[in-house]
Design a protein with these regions (language model features):
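Active-site neighborhoods and metal-handling regions in enzymes and metal-associated proteins
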Residues: 1-247
Length: 247
């Protein structure tokens, strides 16, 4: 049906996520002179949030902040990673969130050294373990994303040192945020600080990413992105040092 409304002598812009089976149908009917990626212009419009979007994302972050506080309280109990995830879903529902914006990461001990760890049934924490909690909720279709590190019962000297370096790197990048600064400069602010303290090789990913209706939207906070920050852009700043301390 769509082919009937397309001018065959003009290019057709296609959404980057459009299923191939639909595109093949248009190609077979020779609808349009060419097919081009139409998502870029939409993505660029979505990069800058308006006042209503910012309000919704503030609420999503507020709910997620409350939830992450309750998850940290759960660490007093002997729940495995899967049980914490189940409790988290209940917490979000109680708070009025609309579910998770991505699959949460709960990593105990050695699992916390993997930035893309999959929650493991039967994984229990023990004294001295670091615990990484990476979670986000949805609120009226808008995403939040937060990462926290806590220690169970005790923390080693190196664990405290790595935590403080990561925290300070985060603050260095946040302090640098203003209109006109590039995303590459934000990445460098955190990465250089971590590198100067001897842990650069353990910071294995970009500094952050844009957030909105999708948890990962176009516009990385990385060394490769030389675009400038402008008012209305919403993005994460999440440096990390990933190593197994004392193991």
């Amino acid at each position: 049906v769509l082919a009937e409304y397309v001018e065959k002598d003009k290019p057709v812009a296609i959404d980057k996520n459009w299923p191939a089976r639909f595109l093949i149908g248009l190609i077979d009917k020779k609808a349009g002179s060419a097919f081009v990626n139409g998502s870029e212009i939409v993505d660029r419009v979505r990069m800058v949030k308006d006042a209503e979007e910012i309000k919704l994302m503030r609420e999503a972050s507020r709910l997620n902040d409350l939830a992450i506080g309750r998850v940290i309280e759960l660490m007093q109990e002997d729940y495995d990673e899967v049980e914490v995830e189940r409790k988290l879903s209940e917490i979000w529902e109680e708070l009025g969130a609309d579910g998770h914006s991505f699959e949460p990461i709960i990593g105990y001990g050695a699992n916390a050294a993997d930035p893309h760890h999959s929650i493991t049934k039967g994984a229990h924490k023990k004294p001295g373990d670091s615990i990484v909690i990476d979670m986000g909720c949805l609120y009226k279709s808008y995403c939040s994303d937060m990462t926290r590190t806590v220690f169970y019962k005790s923390v080693s000297d190196e664990g405290r040192k790595v935590y403080e370096i990561t925290r300070d790197a985060n603050l260095k990048a946040i302090d640098k945020v203003k209109p006109g600064v590039t995303f590459a400069e934000l990445d460098a602010a955190a990465r250089d600080y971590i590198t100067d303290h001897g842990y650069g090789k353990y910071f294995t990913h970009r500094l952050g990413h844009s957030i909105g209706i999708d948890i990962h939207e176009p516009g990385d906070v990385s060394a490769a992105n030389t675009e400038q920050v402008v008012p209305g852009r919403i993005f994460s700043i999440e440096p990390g040092i990933y190593l197994q301390i004392g193991r």
